[in-house]
Amino acid sequence: MALETFVNSEPFTFGVELEIQVVNTHNYDLTKAASDLMRLIQGETFPGNITPEITESMIELSTGICHSHEQAVSELHAIRDVLVKAADQLNVGLCGGGTHAFQQWSDRQIYDAPRFQYISELYGYLAKQFTVFGQHVHIGCPDPDSALFLLHSMSRFIPHFIALSASSPFVQNVDTGFHSARLNSVFAFPLSGRAPFVLTWDSFEEYFTKMVNTGVVNSMKDFYWDIRPKPGYGTIEVRVMDTPLSVDRAAAIACYIQTLARYLLTDRPLKLSEDDYLVYTFNRFEACRFGLEGTCVNPQTGERRTIAEDILDTLDRIAPHAAALGSRAALDEIGALAKARVNDASWLRTVFKQEKSLNETVRQQCLRWRE
């Protein structure tokens, strides 16, 4: 199969995708209701899209093409409200969070769609264990070479996105010690990790053709990279975030990525080298394990600082681009999180400490989702 033609898109436009948990309102475990939700929303009018995901306990919402923070917030609220109304009719709950706190993966049912059934047959129990919930952000790129430049430039900031969105401290009734345990489920897939270090679309097409010829992949969907090109949309897709507990947090993180993209592609402050990836896995682990308190190492200078400090320094550098995009309010929210060194994982742990019940913790997640 040939690689799709890269469709040039308007630079720095963006789209947000959120995978949402569907829970019962008895004990707040995951429940099988995605098909029923999809039936109920037929005929409803809303921006963007709502689609099923790999198991019946997940559903995905996505915005249209957004230009501003204000638009993203408006669209996410509108889609969220349609889903909440349908969920109320079914007496089920919806919530964010990168993992469900106490679900048993073996109870999951694969959604009846050809691709999901194919994944289940190929990956076995990993498909059911993949009942984890992420935020993806697409960024528009003017041409394919710019997309690859942005992909590799953005890779240095992966720890920021993980730490800011982290909302998966609990797995199967256990506090994992991680801020984002969700990404540990992604690591199990053979085509996860980072994209190959190629900087021209011709070279990328050559790589893709070789992979297809091995029989390992059929399309870009088979790559579970942290950031991957989406040629049919003319975007790069940042895929490392947990689904936040509120749509407002999701919009703020998306606009941080948008603003960073404008800075990286307009100012071109970085000279890219494959050696940038020497500390990639270490920095990524630190963000997953310790959140904003984690350490990140500058691959060129060797300087070590906390992820929170690196975010605050980055916010100063990209401030002029925030002004141009109208994303100052979003970046103020990001700055407040970095200064306080708190994220949704911190909030979940605080609730559990107070309530001594993961069932009650998930119930409060559902309340947060409606705010």
UniProtKB/Swiss-Prot annotation:
Catalytic activity: L-cysteine + L-glutamate + ATP = gamma-L-glutamyl-L-cysteine + ADP + phosphate + H(+)
Entry superkingdom: Bacteria
Biological process per Gene Ontology, one example term: modified amino acid biosynthetic process
Keyword Nucleotide-binding attributed: yes
Keywords: ATP-binding, Ligase, Nucleotide-binding
Enzyme's top EC category: ligase
GO terms of molecular function: ATP binding; glutamate-cysteine ligase activity
EC number: 6.3.2.2
Family: Belongs to the glutamate--cysteine ligase type 2 family. YbdK subfamily.
PANTHER family: GLUTAMATE--CYSTEINE LIGASE 2-RELATED
NCBIfam families in the record: gshA_cyan_rel, PRK13516.1
Function: ATP-dependent carboxylate-amine ligase which exhibits weak glutamate--cysteine ligase activity.
Protein's name according to its UniProt entry: Putative glutamate--cysteine ligase 2
Source species of the chain: Burkholderia ambifaria (strain MC40-6)
